[in-house]
Curated annotation (Swiss-Prot):
Cofactor field: [2Fe-2S] cluster; Mg(2+)
HAMAP family, alphabetized: IlvD
Keywords: 2Fe-2S, Amino-acid biosynthesis, Branched-chain amino acid biosynthesis, Iron, Iron-sulfur, Lyase, Magnesium, Metal-binding
PANTHER family xrefs: D-XYLONATE DEHYDRATASE, D-XYLONATE DEHYDRATASE YAGF-RELATED
Protein name, as recorded: Dihydroxy-acid dehydratase
Note accompanying the cofactor annotation: Binds 1 [2Fe-2S] cluster per subunit. This cluster acts as a Lewis acid cofactor.
Subunit structure, as described in the record: Homodimer.
UniProt function note: Functions in the biosynthesis of branched-chain amino acids. Catalyzes the dehydration of (2R,3R)-2,3-dihydroxy-3-methylpentanoate (2,3-dihydroxy-3-methylvalerate) into 2-oxo-3-methylpentanoate (2-oxo-3-methylvalerate) and of (2R)-2,3-dihydroxy-3-methylbutanoate (2,3-dihydroxyisovalerate) into 2-oxo-3-methylbutanoate (2-oxoisovalerate), the penultimate precursor to L-isoleucine and L-valine, respectively.
Encoding gene, per UniProt annotation: ilvD
Any Gene Ontology CC annotation: cytosol
EC category: lyase
Length: 613
C-alpha cells in the first residue's frame, strides 16, 4: 500500500518544525493525515488566456478541502506567444516549457505533495504541466481556463468572425486602410481565454481530454461561460477521490502514466490529426511521452497520419468555425466518438472520471447520449460582450450542430479529407522528418516544386518578404531557428502572415527548422530535423536550389547531387554550423537551454545523455 508522500513532512516527532510551518499556513490539528494536494495555477495579467485564473485556484482549493484534502496553491510562469511574437521575446517561449515543468517538480517534490490539479491554458503552460505530471506520476487532473469567444465585426455590410491572425494579416496588408485595420484589431480578441481558433493552446487543451487527464468539455467550453465553473468545482472533488484511490486502495489506475498510457497517446494523436490541430502539439506530445517513459515517436505519428481522416476544420484553416462552434457540435467527445465509430480509437483507455473511454463516450458524445444535462452543456455559446471575467454569461445556442455531413464535425465518410490534418514528411533535407499542417494547405499545393530563397533568421526573412524580395513559386527557407540554433525554436507566424498580406500565401512554400504558431496555415513546413545548428541538410541549402515537396508521398527533397552536398558539408564543418552575419543577443539562460536541447523530432527536450556518467 503506498504511503502518502506528505507524511514525510506531517508525521513523526522529528518533523515538529515542518508541522509548525504547516500550521502557519492554516493547517489545523485534524488536518494532519489528510492528502496535501497542490493546486498548480498559472494566473498572470500578461496573458488573456490566464488573466481570469486568479480566483480559479481558490475555487478548486475550496472543493478539495470540502472533499477531505488539504489544498496548497502555487503559480507558474506563463508566456503569451502572441505578444512575444515577431521579436526577441519569442526566443523564450519554448524554453519556458521546460522551466514550467521543472518548477512544478521543484514545488511538488520539495513540499511532498500527494497529488495535483493543474490549472493551465495557453501554449507552453499546458505542455509544461503535462511534462511535469508524467514525470512525477502522482494523481493529477487538468482543468484549463477555456477558449476565448471569436471576434465579430461588420465589414462591407457583412458580419464576419475574427481572431488574432486576422488582425495580424490586415495589419500587414498595405491595401487595407488604417481604419479597417484598427477596426479588426479592436474586434479580434473580445474576451479572456485562449485565442479562439484551433491554435496551439486549444489544441493542447483538447488533447488532455483524449489522454484522459481532463473532463469532457475542457478543451471547448468557453472561458466566459457559467458552465465552465463546474469543471473547476468537479476537478477539486475528483482529485481527492483519485488521490485516495491510489494511496488508500492501492489503485494504480489513478496515476497519470496508467491513464495517459501508450494507447491514450495514440488516441490523442488521432484526435490531433482529425481536428487539424497545431503542429506544435507534435513537439509537446513527444516531450510528454518521453517524461512518462512511453515509446512514442515520429514514426508512430507518420503511420497514424496516413489513416486518420480530417473530421473537424476550424480557424485558421477556415473562417467559418471557431472553438465555440466545435463545442456546439459536441466538442472533443464528439470527434472521439466519430473516430471510435470509424475503428480509429482505443476505447478501453481510462479517464480521470474513473470510466473507460467507451463508457465516457456513451455518456458525453452528443450522437449517443440522451442525457439532457449533457446536451444542454454542449449548447453553451458566446455572449458577444467584451470581458475579462470568467463565468460571466450563460448564453446558449437554440440547437446543437449534429450535422455530421456538412457541419463542423463530420463522420469518416463525410470527412473534409480522407487525409488527416497533419503529416510527417521526410527526405534528404529532413532525414529525421518535418511537420506540415495539411489542414491549412490548399489542394493544388499538396505537390510543390520551386527554387529556394534562403534566410539565416526569421528577422531577415520578414524584412525580405516585406521588401518584395520573395517571388511567387519560391520556397522560403528560414534556418538556424531550431531549438539549438535560435535558440528556442521561434514560431514563424509573422513570415507566413506577411506572405499572405503580400499576396503570396498560396503561391509560395515555407520550410524551417523553427516551428509555426497554431495560427499558421498555408504550405508551411516546420520542425526540419536535424536542424541546421546540428548539421542538418537544411543548413546546406543555397538560394536557387530546387526543393520538391510531395505531401501525398510524404516526401521533401533538396534536388542537389550528393557530391555537391558533401562539399558544402565540409565547408560548414569548418565554419561550425552557424548563421552568417546574424546579429542576435543571446542571454546566458538561453545559451544554457541551447546547450542541452535536442532537435524537434525528439520533442526539443533536453538531452539527458549529457547528464549521464
Amino acid at each position: 500500500m503506498p504511503i502518502y508522500r506528505s507524511a514525510t513532512t506531517t508525521h513523526g516527532r522529528n518533523m515538529a518544525g515542518a508541522r509548525a510551518l504547516w500550521r502557519a499556513t492554516g493547517v489545523k490539528d485534524d488536518d494532519f493525515g489528510k492528502p496535501i494536494i497542490a493546486v498548480v495555477n498559472s494566473f498572470t495579467q500578461f496573458v488573456p488566456g490566464h488573466v481570469h485564473l486568479k480566483d480559479m485556484g481558490q475555487l478548486v482549493a475550496g472543493e478539495i478541502e470540502k472533499a477531505g484534502g488539504i489544498a496548497k496553491e502555487f503559480n507558474t510562469i506563463a508566456v503569451d506567444d502572441g505578444i512575444a511574437m515577431g521579436h526577441g521575446g519569442m526566443l523564450y517561449s519554448l524554453p519556458s516549457r521546460e522551466l514550467i515543468a521543472d518548477s512544478v517538480e521543484y514545488m511538488v517534490n520539495a513540499h511532498c505533495a500527494d497529488a495535483m490539479v493543474c490549472i493551465s491554458n495557453c501554449d507552453k503552460i499546458t505542455p509544461g504541466m503535462m511534462m511535469a505530471a508524467m514525470r512525477l506520476n502522482i494523481p493529477v487532473i487538468f482543468v484549463s481556463g477555456g477558449p476565448m469567444e471569436a471576434g465579430k465585426t461588420k465589414l462591407s455590410d457583412q458580419i464576419i468572425k475574427l481572431d488574432l491572425v486576422d488582425a495580424m494579416i490586415q495589419g500587414a496588408d498595405p491595401t487595407i486602410s488604417d481604419e479597417q485595420s484598427e477596426q479588426v484589431e479592436r474586434s479580434a480578441c473580445p474576451t479572456c481565454g485562449s485565442c479562439s481558433g484551433m491554435f496551439t493552446a486549444n489544441s493542447m487543451n483538447c488533447l488532455t481530454e483524449a489522454l484522459g487527464l481532463s473532463q469532457p468539455g475542457n478543451g471547448s467550453m468557453l472561458a466566459t461561460h457559467a458552465d465552465r465553473e463546474e469543471l473547476f468545482i468537479n476537478a477539486g472533488k475528483r482529485i481527492v477521490d483519485l488521490t485516495k484511490r491510489y494511496y488508500e486502495q492501492d489503485d494504480e489506475s489513478a496515476l497519470p502514466r496508467n491513464i495517459a498510457n501508450r494507447a491514450a497517446f495514440d488516441n490523442a494523436m488521432a484526435l490531433d490529426i482529425a481536428m487539424g490541430g497545431s503542429s506544435n502539439t507534435v513537439l509537446h506530445l513527444l516531450a510528454a511521452a518521453q517524461e512518462g517513459d512511453i515509446d512514442f515517436d515520429m514514426g508512430d505519428i507518420d503511420e497514424m497520419s496516413r489513416r486518420v481522416p480530417h473530421l473537424c476544420k476550424v480557424a485558421p484553416s477556415t473562417p467559418k468555425y471557431h472553438m465555440e462552434d466545435v463545442h456546439r457540435a459536441g466538442g472533443v467527445m464528439a470527434i472521439l466518438g466519430e473516430l471510435d465509430r470509424a475503428g480509429l480509437l482505443n476505447n478501453q483507455t481510462r479517464t480521470v472520471l474513473g470510466l473507460s473511454m467507451q463508457e465516457q463516450l456513451a455518456q458525453y458524445d452528443i450522437m449517443q447520449t440522451e442525457d439532457e444535462a449533457v446536451l444542454k452543456f454542449f449548447r453553451a455559446g458566446p455572449a458577444g460582450i467584451r470581458t475579462t471575467k470568467a463565468f460571466s454569461q450563460d448564453c446558449r445556442w437554440d440547437r446543437l450542430d449534429d450535422d455530421r455531413k456538412e457541419g463542423c464535425i463530420r463522420t469518416k465518410e463525410n470527412a473534409f479529407s480522407q487525409e488527416g490534418g497533419l503529416a510527417v514528411l521526410s527526405g534528404n533535407i529532413a532525414v529525421d522528418g518535418c511537420i506540415v499542417k495539411t489542414a491549412g494547405v490548399d489542394e493544388e499545393n499538396l505537390k510543390f516544386q520551386g527554387p529556394a530563397i534562403v534566410f539565416e533568421s526569421q528577422d531577415t526573412a520578414v524584412d525580405g518578404i516585406l521588401a518584395g524580395k520573395v517571388k511567387a513559386g519560391e520556397v522560403v527557407v528560414i534556418r538556424y531557428e531550431g531549438p539549438k540554433g535560435g535558440p528556442g525554436m521561434q514560431e514563424m507566424l509573422y513570415p507566413t502572415t506577411y506572405l499572405k498580406s503580400m499576396g503570396l500565401g498560396k503561391s509560395c512554400a515555407l520550410l524551417t527548422d523553427g516551428r509555426f504558431s497554431g495560427g499558421t496555415s498555408g504550405l508551411s513546413i516546420g520542425h526540419a530535423s536535424p536542424e541546421a545548428a546540428s548539421g542538418g541538410v537544411i543548413g546546406l541549402v543555397n538560394t536557387g536550389d530546387i526543393i520538391t515537396i510531395d505531401i501525398p508521398s510524404r516526401s521533401i527533397t533538396l534536388d542537389v547531387p550528393e557530391a555537391e552536398l558533401e562539399a558544402r558539408r565540409v565547408k560548414q564543418d569548418a565554419l561550425g554550423w552557424k548563421p552568417e552575419n546574424r546579429q542576435r543577443e543571446v542571454s546566458f539562460a538561453l545559451k544554457a537551454y541551447a546547450s542541452m536541447a535536442t532537435s524537434a523530432d525528439k520533442g526539443a527536450v533536453r538531452d539527458k545523455s549529457k547528464l549521464e556518467g
